[in-house]
């Protein structure tokens, strides 16, 4: 790679009903057509296998437990419809609405709920500034809780999002 990095290709196959082997073949073909080359992946191997997300679930489960123990994630049993109703309330301008925090517990609260049957959201630190430079669009500064909010990290069907 031009910047000295390595591109590791992983196949997001967590939505089993919509994942088929022919889609993986098409992904390789499309990426090569765009001139993309990867250092390791499902078709060539490498030291960071496995390259199918579904075969890395134990790694994701361990990360989930670390986040849960640190009080950085919380369970949310709101349906999409519940969230959409809350977001339909008037809000400033045409900005993207932010999750209203309906299920958000007090900061640092550690949930003992299981992963199954409930969505889990990552708690952002409101007011924290995130600055980065987009190679195409230039410098950006985003403020947690204002420009973006808590986000889904684990789905109620027991898969990472």
Predicted regions, residues:
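N-terminal Rossmann-like or analogous alpha/beta NTP/dinucleotide-binding catalytic cores
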Residues: 1-92
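Active-site cores that bind ATP or allylic diphosphates and position pyrophosphate for catalysis
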Residues: 80-161
């Amino acid at each position: 790679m031009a910047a000295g990095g390595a591109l590791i290709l992983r196949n997001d196959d967590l939505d089993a009903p919509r994942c088929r082997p022919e889609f993986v073949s098409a992904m390789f073909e499309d990426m090569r057509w765009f001139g993309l080359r990867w250092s390791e992946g499902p078709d060539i191997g490498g030291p960071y296998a496995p390259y199918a997300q579904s075969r890395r679930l134990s790694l994701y489960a361990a990360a989930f437990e670390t986040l849960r123990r640190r009080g950085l994630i919380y369970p949310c049993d709101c349906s999409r419809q519940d969230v959409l109703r809350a977001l339909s309330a008037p809000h400033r301008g045409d900005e993207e609405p932010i999750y209203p925090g309906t299920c958000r517990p007090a900061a640092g609260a550690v949930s003992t709920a299981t992963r199954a049957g409930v969505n889990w959201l990552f708690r952002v630190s409101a007011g924290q500034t995130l600055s980065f430079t987009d190679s195409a669009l230039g410098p950006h500064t985003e403020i947690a809780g204002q420009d973006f909010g808590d986000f889904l990290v684990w789905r109620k069907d027991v898969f990472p999002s």
